[in-house]
Amino acid sequence: YHLIDAEMVSLDLHDRLEIAPGDSLTVVGPHGTETVGPDEDNLVRRALALAGRTASVTLHKQIPAGAGLGGGSADAAAVLRWAGFTDLRAAAALGADIAFCLVGGRARVTGIGEIVDPLPHDRRTFTIVTPPIFCSTPAVYRAWDEMGGPAGDNGNDLEPAALVVAPELVRWRDELADQTDRRPQLAGSGSTWFVEGAFPDVGRVVTTVPAYEWKRRGD
């Protein structure tokens, strides 16, 4: 495990889970099985095992996997909440942001993710860009360790390591910076970049990037 000190916030971007009696997992939607990974590795499966429950789950995947947005963690937290599971330390052992996803809102998260200190609500608008690049969180942390644990200069210490794992991220960062005249920040271990504000308006295209093949980095 790594010790973290992060500010986390809930977004109005979400997956949807249908839970019924049974023992199966089906992933559908625009960010389905081709990016989520093997069934046995899915955080929904692992959350069910942690809670000692079985269920038939249909996961409607809207949050890109490997984007640093905590989609898999939010799914796991939804299952744990359904099961009535409230042990934040055990939840954090599955993933560093799962305990936060159980609590939600806005918080400072420390330890291995099990210490969740709520912060005041702060309504803000962000523009996010999710490149078609899957950034493996374990791979980014490995790169960070191999680099000697460098500190980032823009609010996220994992950014230098993510750029080693997926150098293509630079192109997307620079394009967003050019279009917004702001320096983008990396979400989590990547691959999402974000800036504060709406450019030019909520729900509209910020910029068009030439066709780019979806890639998985750091398996």
Residue ranges of predicted features:
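Short, hydrophobic beta-strand segments that form beta-sheet elements in well-ordered domains
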Residues: 27, 44-47, 80, 166, ...
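DPxDG-like acidic metal-binding loop motif
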Residues: 67-92
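Predominant activation on well-ordered alpha-helical scaffold segments within soluble catalytic domains
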Residues: 5, 45, 77-80, 141
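ATP-dependent small-molecule kinase catalytic core of the GHMP/sugar-kinase superfamily
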Residues: 2-7, 85-185, 196-219
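Charged catalytic carboxylate motif
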Residues: 43, 75, 168
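Short, active-site-adjacent cap segments at secondary-structure transitions
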Residues: 64-66, 99, 191-194
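Glycine-rich beta-strand-to-loop/alpha-helix junction loops that act as flexible
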Residues: 71-72, 186-191
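ATP-binding N-lobe of GHMP and related small-molecule kinases
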Residues: 1-67, 130
